[in-house]
């Protein structure tokens, strides 16, 4: 089997520089997820694969990139990817990607015309490129598989002005092609009902990079810090998390890392309550270290939000791999097996958060530590990038 992988992943150093020089910052989750996936494929000993990247860069002038050509990069997992060229201007970017991706995909399919088993694996159903993947694979009678991290209607949610109209048009265009792949890789089982309920699929809710399984602090001591890392947004319940902590009587600080629309309000709260610290956006390696040092990690999205049924919070797996205990809401998108290894609540109401924090901190440090270590072992034994990538490769083989 030969694979062409098309995704958004870039070199980490280049990615961090791009983020720092852009006024509109992308989510770090896909970068982490894809790096782990590709490293997992490599660790499975699979080598018949080539890579293309459509980087998630804000349109000029929100980023400094006006154009990029067929730039080649060595990714952190050691493989080389080629950028799909684009003119990075609103209204032109997608059209330029439509043209350039068609040429690159067609060239690869032509080069592998005589191979028996050929598959194009695409991360995210990104309209301009996905259209070419589907049409060209049909023309050459090849398999194409989509890795679906989010439903299109949840990824593009502009709420006002011309952006709202463009978002609706874009989502409608993606829905026309989303059911035309040969197979799918979903984060949750419920996603197949919204994308394609007739095609083969596999559920891979997440994967953990082997590199994040570092030991706990040598002295065994934890800092008295409750921590959240991710999008600093009301959509993800950071406002309720913050207020629940403020009302609690626990002897700890709350440290929040990331960026988002709630940052302004959060900074104002920090001035009123010295226990709460906004730490900004830092490198992923620093986040991993802080997660290992913390006393408790929080991820408290609202279970009543529709999107939580169709998404698995990638931070949940990263948190659990740290060895630090985790408090999460019981989201439909999280498989039941995970809740045996973390603290959980049924909603993210302020009083619920307050009461659960006080309950957890009434437990002995030893009891909390044991839960964190059991969670780490669960992830390490079942959910590493290598294990999950092996499942994906087996699924792709099953399509032939």
What are these regions (language model features)?
Residues 1-68, 115, 243-249, 331:
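N-terminal subdomain of nucleotide-sugar transferases
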Residues 4-6, 217-236, 241-246, 254-255:
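Conserved donor-binding/catalytic core segment of Leloir-type glycosyltransferases
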Residues 35-39, 106, 128-131, 135-140, ...:
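Membrane-proximal helix-turn-helix segments that form the acceptor-binding/catalytic region
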Residues 153, 167, 171-215, 277:
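Donor nucleotide-sugar binding/catalytic pocket of nucleotide-sugar-dependent glycosyltransferases
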Residues 264-291, 296:
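Nucleotide-activated donor-binding/catalytic signature segment of Leloir-type glycosyltransferases, i.e.
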Residues 291-309, 324:
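Acidic donor-binding loop of glycosyltransferase active sites
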Residues 341-351, 359-365:
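Conserved acidic donor-binding segment of nucleotide-sugar-dependent glycosyltransferases
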Residues 362-397:
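A charged, aromatic-enriched C-terminal amphipathic alpha-helix characteristic of glycosyltransferases
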């Amino acid at each position: 089997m030969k694979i062409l992988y098309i995704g958004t992943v870039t070199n980490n150093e280049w990615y961090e520089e791009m983020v720092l020089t852009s006024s509109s910052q992308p989510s770090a989750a896909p970068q982490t997820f894809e790096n782990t996936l590709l490293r997992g494929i490599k660790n499975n000993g699979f080598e018949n694969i080539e890579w293309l990247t459509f980087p998630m860069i804000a349109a000029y002038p929100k980023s400094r990139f006006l154009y990029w050509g067929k730039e080649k990069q060595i990714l952190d997992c050691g493989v080389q990817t080629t950028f799909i060229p684009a003119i990075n201007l609103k209204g032109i970017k997608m059209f330029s990607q439509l043209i350039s991706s068609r040429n690159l995909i067609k060239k690869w399919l032509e080069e592998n015309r005589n191979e028996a088993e050929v598959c194009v694996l695409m991360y995210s159903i990104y309209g301009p490129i996905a259209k070419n993947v589907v049409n060209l694979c049909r023309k050459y009678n090849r398999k194409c598989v989509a890795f679906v991290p989010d439903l299109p209607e949840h990824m593009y949610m502009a709420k006002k002005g011309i952006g709202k109209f463009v978002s609706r048009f874009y989502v409608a265009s993606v829905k026309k092609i989303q059911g035309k792949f040969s197979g799918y890789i979903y984060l949750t089982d419920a996603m197949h009902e919204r994308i394609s309920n007739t095609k083969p699929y596999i559920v891979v809710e997440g994967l953990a990079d082997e590199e994040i399984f570092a030991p706990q602090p040598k002295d065994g001591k934890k800092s008295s810090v409750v921590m959240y890392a991710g999008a600093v947004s009301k959509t993800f319940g950071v406002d309720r998390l913050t207020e629940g902590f403020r009302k609690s009587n626990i002897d700890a600080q709350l440290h929040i890392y990331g960026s988002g629309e709630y940052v302004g309000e959060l900074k104002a709260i920090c001035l009123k309550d010295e226990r709460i610290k906004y730490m900004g956006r830092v490198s992923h390696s620093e986040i991993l270290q802080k997660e290992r040092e913390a006393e408790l990690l929080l991820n408290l999205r609202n279970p009543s939000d529709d999107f939580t049924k169709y998404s698995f919070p990638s931070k949940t797996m990263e948190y659990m791999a740290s060895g630090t205990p985790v408090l999460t809401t019981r989201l439909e998108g999280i498989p039941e097996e995970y809740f045996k290894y973390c603290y959980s609540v049924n909603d993210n109401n302020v009083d619920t958060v307050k009461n659960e924090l006080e309950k957890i901190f009434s437990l002995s440090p030893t009891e909390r530590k044991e839960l964190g270590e059991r969670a780490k072992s669960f992830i390490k034994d079942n959910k590493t990038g290598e294990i999950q990538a092996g499942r994906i490769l087996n699924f792709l083989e099953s399509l032939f």
